[in-house]
Amino acid sequence: MKPFLIAAAVGLFAAPVFADVNITADMPWVTVQTEDGEVEISRIDDPAHELSGEWARTSRNCPNFCVQPMVPAPGVTPIGELELLNMLQDPDAIVVDSRVAADHETGTIPGAISIPYNEATDRLDELGCELDFDGFDCEAAKPVALFCNGNWCGQSPTAARRMIEAGFPADKIHYYRGGMHAWRMLGLTVTGGR
């Protein structure tokens, strides 16, 4: 009996210990609606978890991967993860993954729709604008949050500028500059991808 107790005690101390890793002190998770049903967004419950591969890189060549401004165009509102989570739960808001399809397919934020930055001005109707004789009427535009790969990625800033040029109201655009890099760094849920 004694050897069993010793072995059990050693096993307990050798097992990994996972602490609660909440989003905030009073928010362990958030549930969002996606086209595939409800998805729970939470953080990876392992304080020892580390990023690897492409997401662990700290430097990229500039140009093309230059640090982006907090505000990509006048009137655009920069947001962080908590504001993005609020928008994901708001039925009137749309969260847009502005990355090219190949990037989107590696995984995305649950509840985001894919509108690549180079298609944004052709798809404003999906964001509450109506097609008219002169292009788009964006009087009824919905609040939109744009994101891409991270603070070194120019895809969502380019989408924001092009949308504004096409008539989308700048004050309806929110920019999550941290993008997938910050999202993954925080261990938040990612859907799709390989």
Please provide the spans of the model-predicted regions.
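Bacterial N-terminal signal peptides
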Residues: 6-16
